[in-house]
């Protein structure tokens, strides 16, 4: 059973770790866009459906609640799980929220071997939790130019076929 818990941070943080709701996904997606991650909202929705998903919620001075962190663990089978989409808002980093999120996700993994795809920013925390780098991946992103509105005379576009 998943329950909410007030995180052990300063009183001013007013944060809670709770199961993620579908209504949190646009805010999670916005956090990933802020980090220049390539995930679409549809990717977040898919991962939420197949994963144990958690959110850090922060109460603002006016009483409104904002999603300020995320993390997901997908159980691949009885032996393996994949952990990712771990984000803590910039303003809350360095307060132990990333560690609390990781501990919650690792508890959800149980005895499974956990695979973690992560950014360099989280590496110090992940290594403190026992993760070791086994390989690295470089990600390249670009924005594509729009196709011209009209094709030059005599130019045709057709489906590519093996014939």
Predicted regions and their residues:
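Conserved catalytic-core motifs of GNAT/GCN5-like acyltransferases
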Residues: 113-117, 132-146
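Conserved GNAT acetyl-CoA-binding A-motif
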Residues: 81-83, 108-120
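Short loop/turn motifs at secondary-structure junctions and domain boundaries
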Residues: 44-50
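Solvent-exposed, charged amphipathic helical/linker segments at domain boundaries
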Residues: 145-157
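Conserved beta-strand in the GNAT
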Residues: 55, 63-74, 81-87
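Conserved acetyl-CoA-binding loop-helix of GNAT-fold acetyltransferases
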Residues: 88, 94-107, 124-128
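A short beta-loop-alpha structural element at the N-terminal edge
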Residues: 14-27, 154-163
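Helix-loop element at the rim of GNAT/NAT acetyltransferase active sites that forms part
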Residues: 22-25, 30-42
């Amino acid at each position: 059973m998943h329950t909410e818990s007030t995180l052990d941070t300063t009183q001013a943080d007013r944060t809670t770790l709770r199961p993620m709701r579908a209504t949190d996904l646009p805010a999670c997606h916005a956090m990933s866009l802020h980090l220049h991650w390539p995930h679409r909202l549809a990717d977040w929705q898919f991962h939420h459906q197949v994963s144990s998903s958690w959110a850090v919620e922060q109460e603002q001075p006016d009483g409104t609640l904002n999603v300020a962190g995320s993390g997901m663990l997908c159980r691949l089978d009885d032996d393996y799980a994949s952990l990712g989409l771990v984000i803590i808002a910039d303003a809350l980093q360095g307060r132990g929220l990333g560690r609390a999120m990781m501990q919650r996700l690792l508890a959800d993994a149980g005895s499974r071997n956990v695979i973690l795809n992560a950014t360099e920013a989280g590496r110090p925390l992940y290594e403190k939790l026992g993760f070791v780098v086994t390989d690295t991946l470089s990600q390249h992103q670009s924005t594509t130019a729009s196709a011209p509105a009209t094709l030059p005379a005599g130019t045709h576009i057709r489906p590519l076929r093996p014939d």
